[in-house]
């Protein structure tokens, strides 16, 4: 009998869609009354208004339609995750063209030469940059291109794809967990809770700094072990395969870091800088930043003097490389679609509301944290979870004599830690797919770190409740 092989990300997500569909036949359907929140510009649930509604069980057709509905609603035509999927394909084309020019490989050689003997210091520096993106604007889907960039860098430095993936995922993730001015988490949640988002910022900064130190130490410890003994890598059996995929025959010759390649890397960096500025300052999202990378791909192709045929075929091949990631994003969003159409999202939320009433301050805030953890698995969108839960959960804090800002911190900490591992997150599944790191292996590797971070969060929340 053959050895059991864990299913792919696609199978896991389809299985979760089926499980949630079954739950729509078991969990009673219900809904809160929704009212417009002028500050948010969205309808939000009103506490105390939950009522049962007619059941909307989801069947086989709904399960099969879920990945499609995850990309766009076939009934209304409203976009779902299709903008993110298209962004991924355009990023793939852009990276394909940049890679074709040899600029990335030449740049990698220059970086590794300059950092020879101290490559591990890339880890804290890069994790600090990603954490800044997380805490400032909730860096998520836009972090996916960095996986493709960093894996070859880390492999050339004698690390493994896990080091590259965790540098991005844990870096941006701990930043989001300790969000300070993140408009998609802290600001939305605080507005929904009826408080200024600056309330409680000191505790969030403390969580951010402590969490970053812990994550950096975890990744650097693993990186040193792998560098000293590659057999200790959790993907050691894929070492040659990964080197062939990400580095190709790079070792066969030294690429000259020509002025043209330098210009291409400058454009490469500027594209990401413009993306970050546009999202954080100008309010851009997927359509605008997709256009940035499309324009950048054309500019790079012209500078590299690629022919029209070379440019278009290279772009298409690059997009093809990330097609699987784009599909994962649609499937992951399909889980939430089934929950919403089955009318069980608010029922689960109502059960959570009943559990937190009448508790002590410390018990309340920790129960709140764990409830948000459970809900975060079902609603991986931080802004969606904020709009869904804060209007109901924050008023409950008044009865427990807990400051509302602490509820906001509990929410974003729970959402942040879950989104480091949840299989419903396109960032987790997509990032690991790009780095070719099996999800279950990553989960086992990161589990002790999650335990440490959870203890830190619960201690911080408890201190915040009693001080």
Predicted regions and their residues:
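Long, contiguous bundles of hydrophobic transmembrane helices that form the permeation core
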Residues: 1-6, 10, 34-43, 202-314, ...
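Membrane-core helix-loop-helix motifs of multi-pass transport proteins
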Residues: 2-12, 147-237, 254-258, 262, ...
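C-terminal transmembrane helix pair
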Residues: 7, 356-467
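Core transmembrane alpha-helical segments of multi-pass membrane transporters/permeases
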Residues: 9-10, 14-18, 43-106, 284-347
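Hydrophobic core segments of alpha-helical transmembrane domains in multi-pass membrane transport
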Residues: 10-28, 88-96, 129-133, 175, ...
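Membrane-interfacial loop-to-helix junctions in multi-pass transporters
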Residues: 75-85, 113-125, 157-163, 262, ...
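Alpha-helical transmembrane segments of multi-pass membrane proteins
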Residues: 85-88, 119-134, 159-177, 209, ...
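Hydrophobic alpha-helical transmembrane segments of multi-pass integral membrane proteins
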Residues: 88-90, 118-149, 329-339, 355-395, ...
């Amino acid at each position: 009998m053959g050895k059991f092989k864990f299913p792919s990300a696609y199978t896991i997500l389809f299985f979760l869609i089926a499980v949630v569909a079954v739950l729509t036949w078991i969990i009673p359907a219900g809904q809160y009354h929704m009212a417009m929140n002028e500050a948010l510009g969205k309808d939000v649930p009103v506490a105390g208004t939950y009522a049962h509604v007619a059941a909307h069980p989801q069947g086989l057709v709904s399960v099969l339609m879920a990945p499609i509905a995850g990309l766009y609603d076939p009934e209304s035509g409203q976009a779902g995750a299709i903008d993110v999927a298209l962004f991924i394909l355009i990023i793939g084309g852009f990276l394909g063209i940049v890679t074709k020019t040899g600029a990335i490989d030449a740049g990698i050689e220059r970086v590794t030469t300059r950092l020879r003997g101290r490559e591990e210091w890339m880890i804290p520096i890069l994790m600090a940059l990603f954490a800044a993106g997380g805490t400032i604007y909730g860096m998520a889907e836009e972090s996916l291109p960095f996986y493709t960039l960093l894996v070859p860098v880390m492999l050339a430095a004698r690390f493994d794809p896990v080091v590259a993936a965790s540098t991005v995922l844990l870096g941006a993730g701990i930043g989001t967990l300790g969000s300070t001015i993140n408009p998609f988490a802290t600001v939305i949640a605080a507005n929904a809770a009826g408080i200024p988002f600056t309330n409680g910022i000191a505790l969030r900064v403390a969580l951010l700094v402590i969490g970053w130190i812990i994550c950096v130490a975890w990744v650097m410890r693993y990186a040193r072990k792998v560098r000293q003994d590659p057999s200790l890598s959790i993907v050691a059996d894929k070492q040659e395969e990964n080197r062939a995929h990400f580095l190709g025959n790079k070792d066969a010759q030294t690429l000259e870091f020509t002025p043209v390649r330098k210009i291409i890397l400058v454009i490469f960096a500027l594209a990401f800088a413009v993306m970050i500025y546009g999202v954080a300052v100008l309010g851009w999202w997927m359509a605008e930043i997709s256009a940035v990378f499309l324009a950048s791909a054309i500019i790079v192709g012209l500078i590299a003097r690629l022919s029209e045929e070379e440019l278009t075929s290279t772009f298409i091949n690059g997009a093809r490389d990330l097609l699987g990631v784009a599909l994962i994003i649609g499937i992951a969003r399909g889980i939430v679609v089934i929950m919403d159409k089955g009318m069980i999202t608010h029922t689960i939320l109502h059960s959570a509301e009943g559990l937190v009433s009448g508790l002590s301050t410390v018990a309340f805030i920790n129960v709140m944290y764990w409830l948000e953890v459970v809900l975060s698995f079902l609603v991986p969108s931080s802004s969606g979870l904020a709009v869904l839960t804060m209007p109901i959960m924050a008023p409950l804090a008044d009865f427990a004599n807990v400051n509302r800002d602490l509820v906001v911190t509990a929410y974003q900490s729970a959402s942040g830690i879950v989104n480091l591992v949840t299989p419903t997150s396109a960032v987790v599944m997509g990032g690991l797919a790009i780095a070719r790191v099996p999800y279950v292996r990553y989960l086992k590797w990161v589990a002790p770190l999650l335990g440490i971070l959870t203890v830190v969060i619960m201690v911080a929340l408890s201190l915040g409740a009693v001080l």
